[in-house]
Regions:
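Short hydrophobic beta-strand element within catalytic cores of glycosyltransferases
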Residues: 300-303
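Short alpha-helical donor nucleotide-sugar binding micro-motif in glycosyltransferases
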Residues: 100, 162, 262-263, 270-275, ...
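Nucleotide-activated donor-binding/catalytic signature segment of Leloir-type glycosyltransferases, i.e.
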Residues: 248-266
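Conserved donor-binding/catalytic core segment of Leloir-type glycosyltransferases
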Residues: 206-241
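Conserved acidic donor-binding segment of nucleotide-sugar-dependent glycosyltransferases
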Residues: 314-325, 331-336
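Aromatic "clamp/platform" in nucleotide-sugar-dependent glycosyltransferases that forms part
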Residues: 283
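Donor nucleotide-sugar binding/catalytic pocket of nucleotide-sugar-dependent glycosyltransferases
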Residues: 156-202
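A charged, aromatic-enriched C-terminal amphipathic alpha-helix characteristic of glycosyltransferases
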Residues: 336-364, 370
Length: 370
């Protein structure tokens, strides 16, 4: 699907089911479509994948499209090994087949590579249907950090998974470059947005703690490299907002750190806005929505120079934060950043633009369905 097409003459060469797809879309106005998204990450999980899908779906609904997300909540599930808060679907194939065929989508997007993603991919390949995928999470690095499985094995599997589709969406240019080198094909840029009404500078001070206040927001787990933040020798106070499998252990190990547990909505925005620097220690995130949320609240960012921070901060890093190999040096440098510039930079990222980019990369389902 491509924005700006208003008649069949604008559509690339198509025939059969694909031509009928475009004819039906264009006959009823500005590209209304039935879009089915399959995701192993969905409510009640709280993470960047879920937040991205939730917001994009809301934007697509506002644009007049019919969108449904199929997540693990519809299936028998078991807890994920080493991370019981995440539930994985068990043998979802037949039930998922019925859901897909009942919904009769114009376009199929497979957001994750778990049991649901694998089942949806199998359904599409058996019927000769086209689909798109997305690379949200560095599972090879996550699995390696937890059980030591070599990342090259998992990337080989992921490459086969994604290359069977008609396009893999990636959040940043540096991730696109990396995945191209790893042999992934048909990569499509799909950036992210931020809720500028919720996440904004606030006058009230949230924290009654010694300044400066350095804050981390996110999952308290090994793959987030949170130890790199907790072990920093910094002045003032360190705050951790979020839950996760390492929360209890880290509380015991770092009694001087202020752990709040998870916060949402206005409370989360206040946590960002009341901080002097947002510290993002992750080495494996593919984007980092929390970076944008902090910037939208006027809070500068300190991070390693890796995919995600490198792309979001880009050439403005000196004004809105700092990135580099030394996280402590970056955190101290970020104290000098311009909070107004942080907000202005975040305003460049729109969820509507994110949804439009997603829409532009979808492909007609085609194939043969019962």
């Amino acid at each position: 699907m491509r924005r700006g097409w208003s008649s069949l003459s604008d559509v690339p060469t198509a025939s059969g089911p694909e031509l009928e797809y475009w004819r039906r879309l264009l006959a009823v106005g500005p590209l209304p479509a039935r879009i089915l998204i399959i995701s192993d990450a969905w409510l009640p999980q709280v993470n960047g994948v879920v937040r991205t899908l939730q917001t994009v779906v809301a934007e697509l609904h506002a644009m007049g499209h019919t969108v449904e997300v199929v997540g693990p909540d519809r299936f028998l599930t078991l807890p994920c090994p080493t991370y019981p808060d995440i539930r994985l679907s068990v043998a979802p194939g037949r039930q998922l087949n019925r859901i897909i065929e009942s919904f009769a989508p114009d376009a199929l997007h497979i957001a994750t590579e778990g049991p649901l993603g694998q089942a949806a991919r199998g359904w599409a390949l058996r019927r000769g249907c086209a689909f798109t995928t997305a690379f949200h999470t560095r599972f090879p690095e996550y699995v390696n950090a937890r059980i030591g499985l070599p990342t090259r094995w998992l990337y080989a599997w992921l490459r086969r998974f994604h290359n069977a589709g008609q396009g893999m969406m990636v959040a940043t240019q540096s991730l696109r470059d990396e995945m191209t080198e790893r042999g992934f094909r048909q990569l499509r840029p799909w950036s992210r947005g931020v809720d500028l009404d919720l996440f904004r500078p606030l006058p009230a001070c949230t924290w009654n703690l010694p300044r400066p206040i350095f804050t981390y927001v996110g999952r308290v787990s090994v793959e987030k490299n949170i130890g790199a933040f907790l072990n920093l020798d910094l002045p003032g106070s360190k705050v951790v907002v979020g839950g996760g499998p390492q929360l209890a252990a880290q509380r015991r190990t770092h009694p001087a750190v202020h752990f709040t547990g998870p916060r949402y909505g206005a409370e989360l925005a206040a946590a960002y806005a009341g901080s002097d620097v947002f510290v993002f220690p992750s080495l494996t995130d593919t984007f980092g929505l929390v970076i944008l949320e902090a910037l939208a609240c006027g809070t500068p960012v300190a991070a390693f120079d890796v995919t995600g921070p490198r792309d979001v901060l880009a050439d403005a890093a000196g004004c809105i934060g700092a990135i580099g190999p030394d996280l402590r040096a970056a955190a101290m440098a970020a104290l000098k950043a311009d909070r107004a510039a942080c907000r202005a930079h975040a305003e460049r990222f729109s969820w509507r633009a994110c949804a439009e980019a997603f829409l532009s990369h979808l492909v007609p389902l085609g194939g043969h369905t019962p």
